[in-house]
Curated annotation (Swiss-Prot):
Its EC number is 1.10.3.9. One of its GO terms (cellular component) is plasma membrane-derived thylakoid membrane. One of its GO terms (biological process) is photosynthetic electron transport in photosystem II. It comes from Synechococcus sp. (strain CC9902). It is a multi-pass membrane protein. Pheophytin a binds at Q128, N141. 2 of the reaction center chlorophylls (ChlD1 and ChlD2) are entirely coordinated by water. This is Photosystem II D2 protein.
Length: 351
C-alpha cells in the first residue's frame, strides 16, 4: 500500500492579508476599510479641530470657532482665501511651507477635510460593495449611496472648480451651508433651475413614499401576537409574511384607483425616486459651476422695466436676487472692497 503525503499549499502575504482584512469581527475592516477608516478619521478630526480652534479672520474676515465664541450652529471650517485659487494647500506646499499655524490661517483645513471627506464617502460605498459581495446580495445599497457622494463632490469640489477658487465652495458648518444656499439663489437663481426642481421632487417624493410605505405596513400587520405591542410579535427568522400586501393593495386601490401589486417594483421605485433626485440636483450644481443659466424669462423683465404696474412672481424674485447680490457681495467678499452707490441698489417697481 502506498501512502501519498501532500504538501500544504503555499500562502503568500496577499492571501494572509486578505484573510485578516475579511475576518469576522465586531467592526468589519475589509479592503475598503484601508481607504475608509483613515480618511474618515482624518476628515472628522480635521473638522472638529477647525470648528474648535481655527479662525476665519484671514480668509473671510469672520469668527468661526468655539474658541472665538461661536456655537454649534455658527462654527465652521471655512474655505481658503480667494487668493489661493485652486491650490491643494498641502501643508508642505509653497503657501504654508510647513508652518501649521499659517496653513490653518490660509484655509488648509478646509481642503484637508474636503478631500479626505470625499475619499471617506467613496470608501464607505466600496465597503457596501465589498460586504454585499461577501454576503452574496446585490449591490443596490452602494448604488443608492452614490447619490450622497454625487451631491458632496458636485457641491464641495466641482462647483468651486468651475468658479475662481475654493473660496466659493460652502464652508463646513450649519450656518455656513445656509449662507451658501442664499449665495446660490442670489447669483444663480437656483430655485428656478429645473435640476433643482427635480432634486426637490426626488427628495420630498422619497420622504413621502417612505412615510406612506411605513404607514401602510403598520396598518396591515398580521395580528399574530397576544400583546398590545405588535413589535414583539416579529421574529427576524420567521418564514411567513409580517404584513398583508393584498390588504395594502386593496386599500390603495380604493384611495387612488391604482396601487402597487409587486413588492419588488414598489421597493425599486422607493430607491429610484430619491436617488434620481440626488443625481439630478448634482447635475444642476455642475451646471452652476459653469455659470449656465436656466429659465431666464427676459420678456417679463423687459415689460416690468417698461411698465411700473406690471410685475410677476418671477420679476419679484429677480429683484430679490439682485438685492442678494448687491448686499451680500460686500459682506461675503470683503477682500474685493465692493462699494455699491445707493442709486444702483435694486428697488421694486412700487418704489
Amino acid at each position: 500500500m502506498t501512502i501519498a503525503v501532500g504538501r500544504a499549499p503555499q500562502r503568500g502575504w496577499f492571501d494572509v492579508l486578505d484573510d485578516w482584512l475579511k475576518r469576522d469581527r465586531f467592526v468589519f475592516i475589509g479592503w475598503s476599510g484601508l481607504l475608509l477608516l483613515p480618511t474618515a478619521y482624518m476628515a472628522i478630526g480635521g473638522w472638529l479641530t477647525g470648528t474648535t480652534f481655527v479662525t476665519s479672520w484671514y480668509t473671510h474676515g469672520i469668527a468661526s470657532s468655539y474658541l472665538e465664541g461661536c456655537n454649534f450652529l455658527t462654527a465652521a471650517v471655512s474655505t481658503p482665501a480667494d487668493a489661493m485659487g485652486h491650490s491643494l494647500l498641502l501643508l508642505w506646499g509653497p503657501e504654508a511651507q510647513g508652518d501649521f499655524v499659517r496653513w490653518c490661517q490660509l484655509g488648509g483645513l478646509w481642503a484637508f477635510v474636503a478631500l479626505h471627506g470625499a475619499f471617506a464617502l467613496i470608501g464607505f460605498m466600496l465597503r457596501q460593495f465589498e460586504i454585499a459581495r461577501l454576503v452574496g446580495i446585490r449591490p443596490y445599497n452602494a448604488i443608492a449611496f452614490s447619490g450622497p457622494i454625487a451631491v458632496f463632490v458636485s457641491v464641495f469640489l466641482m462647483y468651486p472648480l468651475g468658479q475662481s477658487s475654493w473660496f466659493f465652495a460652502p464652508s463646513f458648518g450649519v450656518a455656513a451651508i445656509f449662507r451658501f444656499l442664499l449665495f446660490l439663489q442670489g447669483f444663480h437663481n437656483w430655485t428656478l433651475n429645473p435640476f433643482h426642481m427635480m432634486g426637490v421632487a426626488g427628495i420630498l417624493g422619497g420622504a413621502l413614499l417612505c412615510a406612506i410605505h411605513g404607514a401602510t405596513v403598520e396598518n396591515t400587520l398580521f395580528e399574530d401576537g397576544e400583546q398590545a405591542n405588535t413589535f414583539k410579535a416579529f421574529e427576524p427568522t420567521q418564514e411567513e409574511e409580517t404584513y398583508s400586501m393584498v390588504t395594502a393593495n386593496r386599500f390603495w386601490s380604493q384611495i387612488f384607483g391604482i396601487a402597487f401589486s409587486n413588492k419588488r417594483w414598489l421597493h425599486f421605485f422607493m430607491l429610484f425616486v430619491p436617488v434620481m433626485g440626488l443625481w439630478t440636483s448634482s447635475i444642476g450644481i455642475i451646471g452652476l459651476a459653469l455659470n449656465l443659466r436656466a429659465y431666464d424669462f427676459v420678456s417679463q423683465e423687459i415689460r416690468a422695466a417698461e411698465d411700473p404696474e406690471f410685475e410677476t412672481f418671477y420679476t419679484k424674485n429677480i429683484l430679490l436676487n439682485e438685492g442678494l447680490r448687491a448686499w451680500m457681495a460686500p459682506a461675503d467678499q470683503p477682500h474685493e472692497n465692493f462699494v455699491f452707490p445707493e442709486e444702483v441698489l435694486p428697488r421694486g417697481n412700487a418704489l
